[in-house]
Amino acid sequence: MSELEKAMVALIDVFHQYSGREGDKHKLKKSELKELINNELSHFLEEIKEQEVVDKVMETLDNDGDGECDFQEFMAFVAMVTTACHEFFEHE
């Protein structure tokens, strides 16, 4: 498997490690999203401690307004973070 294919599988795996702990196994609730960000993105994003921050992140990601983050919305988030990191490291 190529590095890109491994990365794609890892993204799917990480999403499903956190989704469905508290409901729909295909979506992240706010608490699941917070845990995922704090555990899996700790080198790129600050730890989320305040509920307001979680609410704001979810509001930004939740395109369909269901109060949860589906895989497509999660991937949009990953793309945003990856783009920001790429731009940061490109200028160093």
UniProtKB/Swiss-Prot annotation:
Positions carrying N-acetylserine: 2
Primary subcellular site in the record, as a coarse category: cytoplasm
Pfam family, one: EF-hand_1
UniProt keyword annotations, A-Z: Acetylation, Calcium, Cell adhesion, Cytoplasm, Metal-binding, Nucleus, Repeat, Secreted, Zinc
Gene Ontology cellular component list: ciliary basal body; cilium; cytoplasm; cytosol; extracellular region; extracellular space; intracellular membrane-bounded organelle; microtubule cytoskeleton
Molecular-function annotations in GO: calcium ion binding; calcium-dependent protein binding; identical protein binding; protein homodimerization activity; RAGE receptor binding; S100 protein binding; tau protein binding; zinc ion binding
Residues that bind Zn(2+): 16, 26, 86, 91
Function, as annotated: Small zinc- and- and calcium-binding protein that is highly expressed in astrocytes and constitutes one of the most abundant soluble proteins in brain. Weakly binds calcium but binds zinc very tightly-distinct binding sites with different affinities exist for both ions on each monomer. Physiological concentrations of potassium ion antagonize the binding of both divalent cations, especially affecting high-affinity calcium-binding sites. Acts as a neurotrophic factor that promotes astrocytosis and axonal proliferation.
Domain of life: Eukaryota
Tissue specificity annotation: Although predominant among the water-soluble brain proteins, S100 is also found in a variety of other tissues.
Entry protein name: Protein S100-B
Residue positions binding Ca(2+) 2: 62, 64, 66, 68, 73
Gene3D superfamilies: EF-hand
InterPro entries, per database record: EF-hand-dom_pair (IPR011992), EF_Hand_1_Ca_BS (IPR018247), EF_hand_dom (IPR002048), S100-B (IPR028481), S100/CaBP7/8-like_CS (IPR001751), S100_Ca-bd_sub (IPR013787)
Gene Ontology terms describing biological process: adaptive thermogenesis; astrocyte differentiation; axonogenesis; cell adhesion; cellular response to hypoxia; central nervous system development; learning or memory; long-term synaptic potentiation
Subunit structure and binding partners: Dimer of either two alpha chains, or two beta chains, or one alpha and one beta chain. The S100B dimer binds two molecules of STK38. Interacts with CACYBP in a calcium-dependent manner. Interacts with ATAD3A; this interaction probably occurs in the cytosol prior to ATAD3A mitochondrial targeting. Interacts with S100A6. The S100B dimer interacts with two molecules of CAPZA1. Interacts with AGER. Interacts with PPP5C (via TPR repeats); the interaction is calcium-dependent and modulates PPP5C activity. Interacts with TPPP; this interaction inhibits TPPP dimerization.
PANTHER family given in the database record: PROTEIN S100-A1-RELATED, S100 CALCIUM-BINDING PROTEIN
Sequence ranges assigned to domain EF-hand in this UniProt record: 13-48, 49-84
